[in-house]
Amino acid sequence: MFTDVTSKAGINFKYTIGDFTYKNILESSGSGITVFDFNNDGLMDLYLMNGAYLQGISDPDGKVFKNAHNELYKNNGDGTFTEVSKKAGVGGHQWSEAAGAIDLDNDGYQDLYVLNYGPNIFYHNNGDGTFRDITGSLGLAGPEKLNGFTKWSIGVSFWDYNKDGRLDAMVGNFMAFDPSYKSPGTPDLMPSPAEYNGQASMLYEQLPNGKFIDVTQKNNLYFPNSKCMGLTVFDYDNDGDLDIFQANDHQLNFLFRNDDGVYKEVAVAAGVAANDQGIGTGSMHASIGDIDGDGLIDILVSDLDHGALYRNLGNGTFEDITKVSGLASEMEGKGCWGAQFLDYDNDGDLDIVTANGTAEELILQYPLLLENDGKGHFKNVGKEHGSYFSTKRSGRGLAVWDFNNDGFLDIIISHVDKLATAALLKNEGGNGNHWLGLTLKGKNGPASAIGAKVTVTAGGKKQVLINQWATSYLSNNDPRLHVGLGLQNQIDQLDINWSDGKKEVYRNIIADCYLTILQGKGLVAK
């Protein structure tokens, strides 16, 4: 059962869109969510993106929202949160879409990279509850314009693309938004994304001096008219290299296969470029996980039609099982934005939660909680699991986390409807199933931990997990790995394939706790 505890928790965030009227595609995109522990107290905190008034885009009446800002909620550990964005120095009055939390300099504290319509901002965590803007020294603001219009960034994935031990960053950019454009046939309606040009996503390489340079074209990743809505980095073909899935809006998706540092776009050949009708839809992002227990990582792509579920066949290709899995009938016409795999009942298989709402107009939809039967077939059980799932909303960003550290995954969803509030859904748990939470730390920082593959064996059952939390629309999930164990109260064996190629094995791990594993040193903290 999920209980809406938003008000009780003190989360008073309201998405403003910088306006009173909902009239353009920028305003329809919604608010991103980032889960991270900014003060290292073992409790996950929350960063919510907002849209401030934009001169020349927002209606003049929207000037009352010129001071709208992003909000940082510190977890108090008692089920409540305190908003501390101004004290921490991460409020800002820009139009923000998403943020990536990462310990860039390996000082033990999570930094924050905020992606905006306009210049991006990188906040360094000072370790005392405050942040400072170091964007200029890093070179991560991004270009002022792309394809002739203001740069519109929607997300970031960090990983060590060239295996030099330093974190690099790929920034997803969406489209060349012309605020003055009106559709010829329907000038009073919001234009479709298909009517605009795109903007190239950009790969930034970190140099030994800590600065970043644009290496997009050098790595065959430059597509100047693409319309990225989400980036997911993982090793889909099990060759030891991290690949890139780019979800594109009203275009074919991209899958950049990494062969020893050389990228090639293979989405069509791999079977993940389009939906089951061969059409590039309004893809939002990709969530990854093994939905049928075969040890291979599958891909869930949310879109405004019925989404796509691609089953990994283990030979570098995927099979579209959206219909046979039951997803097509459950998600048809819902307008899905955020969608995420999670084992909400800790029974040892991955379920799905979605945030829904029609794009062009504020047509509300029911959110979905889709139960996995263990074989990759899904059924909506939302209305049986809380009143939120019986209430139509217009959802956007969605993150899965465990805010109270009880081992049962909670959910937070942002909205662009008239309420425009976030919804914190507490998982009441109570079924007696066991679980394990895991934080991976690489030997020399996050570089060898991001994208690492973890195989958990308990009671003869194997589950494969990928250490990647940037897998939701505009949002970052709880950075800790979570695995449901059903009735098993210990893990017999835990295998880690680190992203730098190193391998480690651990045995006989007691369940129902959060652990930290430091590469080369083993279990270092609970």
In which residue ranges do the predicted regions lie?
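Beta-propeller blade signature
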Residues: 69-76, 197-206, 257, 367-373
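Gly/Ser/Thr/Pro-enriched helix-cap/hinge segments flanking short amphipathic alpha-helices
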Residues: 19-20, 211, 329, 360-363, ...
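Repeat-based blade/solenoid architectures
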Residues: 11-32, 66, 88-100, 139-157, ...
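Hydrophobic beta-strand segments that make up the repeating blades of beta-propeller
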Residues: 43-50, 107, 111-116, 169-173, ...
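Beta-propeller blade termini
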Residues: 30-40, 74, 95-110, 124, ...
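Asp-box/WD-like beta-propeller blade repeats and closely related beta-sheet repeat scaffolds
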Residues: 84-104, 115-161, 176-194, 198-200, ...
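Short, conserved, GDST-rich strand-edge loop motifs in beta-rich repeat architectures
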Residues: 49-65, 174-196, 354-363
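Beta-propeller fold detector
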Residues: 3-7, 82-86, 132-138, 213-217, ...
